[in-house]
Amino acid sequence: MNLSIQEELQPFVEELQRYITPEFLEELAREMKFVKRKRKFSGSDLATICIWISQRVASDPLVRLCSRLHAVTGTVLSPEGLNKRFNEKSVLFLKHVFSLLLQQKICEQTYISNQLLSHFKRIRIMDATMFQVPHTLEHIYPGSGGCAQTAGIKIQLEYDLHSGQFFNFQVGPGKNNDKTFGTECLDTLRPGDLCIRDLGYFSLEDLDQMDQRGTYYISRLKLNTNVYVKNPSPEYFKNGAIKKQSEYIQINVIQILNQLQPGETIEYQQAYIGDKQQLFSRLVFHRLTAAQLQKRLKKIAEKEKSKHRTYSEKSKLVAGLNVYVTNAPWEWVPMEQVHELYTLRWQIEIVFKTWKSLFDIDHCRTVKQERIECHLYGKLIAIFLCSSTMFKMRQLLLQKKKKELSEYKAIGMIQDHLFLLYQSIQNTQEITKLLTRLFHLLQQNGRKSHRYEKKTVFDIMGVIYEYSGCSKQKKAA
């Protein structure tokens, strides 16, 4: 049945508004003892100022925040009174609302059809973003070190590229270890998932666990990891048995780098990785192009400067090589596609870019801890609402118009409509009308730009879609 845009949006809207209506927030505030009796500052007021109307709770003057709150809700508070309301109970309240949103089934309605879905039920991308907070909080949020980073907050995220669902989420100190978070998330894996991990999460033990659970992975390999392949000319005993120590030979990474042309890829299908912890896997070497290498060397130079670290000449030399390990069957992911699939991981960089450039999640002055945390969780709730809406619009635009949505453009436009969403939050019909208008705006102005000979996410995932450019139509195979 061919449903209208409004009919398609109706169940999404009902799920979206479940935990953010004023009535629900008031009831939750009483349950959590945030509000014990009728007061002039309610749970709904806290949500209004932290989620809906204020851009920077942790950096805007309190007088301005009070003024905005009064303009929207009529609530009158002094700056000192508002500052007192940013307390531990406020933080717990907002954190709980965010937790409820993460548990919703909302993303079950945002899957997009693509070729990868026939092999991988979910494409799990994991990464972290970090930002500095006032040094007065270094005992609570110690930073990762480096130039002036005495205090910082790190946010870990794992989400599904098919649907936009947030699987795992953690807010913690900047010094927290990425690899530890990756290991903690293993229990949420399901057979048929594809995990794409970068070097920060590299662990042979974790990859082995994924393999045992029926989960697929594509991971960068640390170049100091010993790698062995079958010896084409092993030594034999007189009885014909292979001498164990000659069955495998160690790979020389520098040698492979010199053999490959820029942009070229080679594969060893049965590689033996590691010494103490052993993993049998496909091993793919991809040499960077000159432009890619230049970009990477620039990043290395920046790290050397900011973290006061010196990279060896060998490290800089092998920086021209990407080495991947994967247990995905060759029939599903040929050698040439391994690097391409890995680049899907960069989508999470776009997600984090919106957090900082559009939502100003990293903007904070030297204010108390609870005010910064209210700002943080208020922003995360707003981000989740905009992100969920974006993934629904992406699915609808593909389904109805066969177009690819630009995630970055769409998030910005949806954020512009956030206050209108707040105004209509109690009325399902009004929200549906608003999102229908938004859909038509995104159809007009939110489509993905296509650069010459550069594949988009839809191209890599094998999504069937169309776009107009240079008087021609294109479909991703």
Curated annotation (Swiss-Prot):
Disulfide bond annotation, renumbered to this chain: none
Superkingdom of this protein's organism: Bacteria
Keywords of this entry: DNA recombination, DNA-binding, Transposable element, Transposition
Pfam hit, one: DDE_Tnp_1
One biological process term in Gene Ontology: DNA transposition
UniProt similarity note: Belongs to the transposase 11 family.
Record's function text: Involved in the transposition of the insertion sequence.
Protein name in the entry: Transposase for insertion sequence element IS231F
Species the sequence originates in: Bacillus thuringiensis subsp. israelensis
Organism phylogeny: Bacteria, Bacillati, Bacillota, Bacilli, Bacillales
